[in-house]
Amino acid sequence: MSSEQLQDPVEPDKILSAVTQRGLRLESILTTHHHLDHAGGNLDLVTKCRKQGLEGLKVYGGDDRIGGLTDTVSHGYKXRLVATSTFIAWLHHRHTTGHICYLVTEENSTKEGAVFTGDTLFLGGCGRFFEGTAEQMFKALIEVLSKLPTTTKVYCGHEYTVKNLEFGLTVEPKNEALKHRLEAVKRLRASNQASVPGTIGEELATNPLMRVSEPDVLAHAKTTDPIKAMKTIREEKDRF
């Protein structure tokens, strides 16, 4: 029986049904932050697993407000998920304090890794600054996530990509890569397919919040400071 981990499992019944159908065994939950649309299913899932005789389900997270938390992780925490996979946790105090992104990689493999970003990085955008600042978001997006290999898969917490890319064109109306990506994502959504995952490379080419050092983005924000540009552009997105 294969062992698997979950990311922000908010619908326990659907998850358990899928796990049973596939003959899997749950070992861990990676929780990005405490908001109920991400962590709201943790306690129910842990309880139902126990009723099925599954003890020892680990719940990772960086905030004691997370339901069912068993293992608190901090920035740079590294752990093994299953026999061949590990994860590294990055703490980002900007959407909420204690928000964690998880980079999952396979050992001794040439496959691209996957980063689970919750509400820090969306495809084409980023989360609101509920408990954090533009400086903290800059560190998360530019100093950490943008340094990942461009082929790294990005799994974010919400399907906001069309709206984000439409907003992006108000910032960079001449960005051809952005125009092409928006049309491609619209086709996916029209056929009821998800836009997630994306890649770090796509974000670097089309996400204005990851392009705050680009001349056109700085000019749009009327500043030469990338952090001020990030603050201005996120505030514009709030009103979009």
UniProtKB/Swiss-Prot annotation:
It catalyses: an S-(2-hydroxyacyl)glutathione + H2O = a 2-hydroxy carboxylate + glutathione + H(+). One of its GO terms (biological process) is methylglyoxal catabolic process to D-lactate via S-lactoyl-glutathione. Keywords: Hydrolase, Metal-binding, Zinc. InterPro entries: Clx_II_MBL, HAGH_C, Hydroxyacylglutathione_Hdrlase, Metallo-B-lactamas, RibonucZ/Hydroxyglut_hydro. It is an enzyme of class 3 (hydrolase). It holds the Pfam family Lactamase_B. Its EC number is 3.1.2.6. Zn(2+) 1 binds at H33, H35, H95, D119. Substrate binds at R128, H158, E159, Y160, R234, E235, E236, K237. Pathway: Secondary metabolite metabolism; methylglyoxal degradation; (R)-lactate from methylglyoxal: step 2/2. GO terms for molecular function: hydroxyacylglutathione hydrolase activity; metal ion binding. Its cofactor is Zn(2+). Binds 2 Zn(2+) ions per subunit. Zn(2+) 2 binds at D37, H38, D119, H158. Disulfide bonds: none annotated. Belongs to the metallo-beta-lactamase superfamily. Glyoxalase II family. Thiolesterase that catalyzes the hydrolysis of S-D-lactoyl-glutathione to form glutathione and D-lactic acid. This is Probable hydroxyacylglutathione hydrolase.
